[in-house]
Regions:
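Charged alpha-helical initiation segments
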Residues: 2-102
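Short non-catalytic regulatory patches outside canonical folded cores
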Residues: 92-152
Length: 152
């Protein structure tokens, strides 16, 4: 039996995900252990700049995974038969139901370039301030070089 892979499956089994997880696992383990032993420590402040970057990158990647998973859930909701929707959600009109999930889908889709920009900014050390780092600002940034974005 050939099971269909979801985008989440592909995302979390990608080379980037595997490398990030393998790099960050011992760091996170050590920092959590230190924080448990000494409650005065701040997890986010532990580690050298490289370790902090890896912890930030894995958090952004996890956020990307959450958004992708949410998109997959929206598709499930949008596939529901009209009669089934009416049975499950009798207080909602079909228009309200579908508008809600379609808006949710659009919001999630629109957040993907921003999350990817944050991930690139973190991994490539572009130095773009977080408040100015969006998918739409990357093409205009002088800090992003052709070497950072390669066609493969």
């Amino acid at each position: 039996m050939n099971e269909e892979k979801t985008f989440s499956d592909i995302l979390f089994k990608s080379t980037l995900a595997v490398r990030l997880i393998n790099l960050v696992k011992p760091i996170v383990s050590s920092h959590l252990e230190q924080c448990l032993a000494d409650k005065s420590l701040n997890y986010d402040e532990l580690g050298d700049e490289h370790e902090k970057m890896l912890k930030k990158a894995i958090a952004i990647y996890a956020n990307l995974g959450t958004v992708v998973s949410d998109l997959e859930k929206v598709v499930v909701f949008l596939r529901l038969d009209k009669e089934k929707v009416s049975q499950i959600y009798p207080d909602l009109s079909l228009e309200e139901y579908y508008n809600y999930h379609l808006e949710n889908y659009v919001i999630r889709i629109n957040s993907l370039p921003d999350i990817l920009a944050q991930l690139g900014n973190t991994i490539c050390n572009w130095g773009i301030p977080k408040k100015k780092c969006y998918g739409t600002t990357i093409p205009d940034s002088t800090k992003v070089t052709d070497e950072d974005i390669k066609n493969k």
